[in-house]
């Protein structure tokens, strides 16, 4: 299990990572579910992403989450390909995997993520979507949303 001090550090990072704007953590209880083996970030592909400093936000998060790597498998979903190409070395160095599995999805719901882990018994599976809003200093663009999906799979499921 991740040390409590590191959990708090990660929480502070999530709450302060948008140096490029402001954000609101909608669910303050996320640490209750943020404790096993896997974190999945989902960046829904909006046209707005073309106007957002995604690279800077990700660089900041990557630097902070490097120390979490021993405790979690971190996967980043639906990163626009142009950002993925630029950030590939950084993501690899932080042991962060990425995929564009939602690019062809019409709704981008949690089952799309769950389908990637069919080999795992998901009966005690807990998933929660945390909605983070970034205020972007652009003339025509005010806000875009980033959904952090934390998938917590019990240790029993992983070994069954």
Curated annotation (Swiss-Prot):
Membrane spanning stretches: 39-59, 136-156
Localisation: Membrane
Keywords carried by this UniProt record: Membrane, Transmembrane, Transmembrane helix
Keyword Transmembrane: yes
Keyword Repeat annotated: no
Domain of life assignment: Eukaryota
Family (UniProt): Belongs to the UPF0479 family.
UniProt protein name: UPF0479 membrane protein YER190C-B
Species whose genome carries this gene: Saccharomyces cerevisiae (strain ATCC 204508 / S288c)
């Amino acid at each position: 299990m991740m040390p409590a001090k590191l959990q708090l550090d990660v929480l502070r990072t999530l709450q302060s990572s948008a140096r490029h704007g402001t954000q609101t953590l909608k669910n303050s209880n996320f640490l209750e579910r943020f404790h096993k083996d896997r974190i999945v970030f989902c960046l829904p592909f909006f046209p707005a992403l073309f106007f957002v400093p995604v690279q800077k936000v990700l660089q900041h998060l990557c630097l902070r989450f490097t120390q979490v790597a021993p405790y979690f498998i971190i996967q980043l979903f639906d990163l626009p390909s142009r950002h993925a190409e630029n950030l590939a070395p950084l993501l690899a160095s932080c042991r962060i995997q990425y995929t564009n599995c939602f690019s062809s999805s019409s709704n981008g719901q949690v089952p799309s993520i769950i389908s990637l882990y069919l080999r795992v018994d998901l009966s005690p599976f807990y998933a929660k979507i945390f909605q983070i809003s970034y205020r972007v200093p652009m003339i025509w663009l005010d806000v875009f949303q980033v959904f952090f999906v934390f998938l917590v799979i019990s240790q029993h499921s992983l070994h069954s």
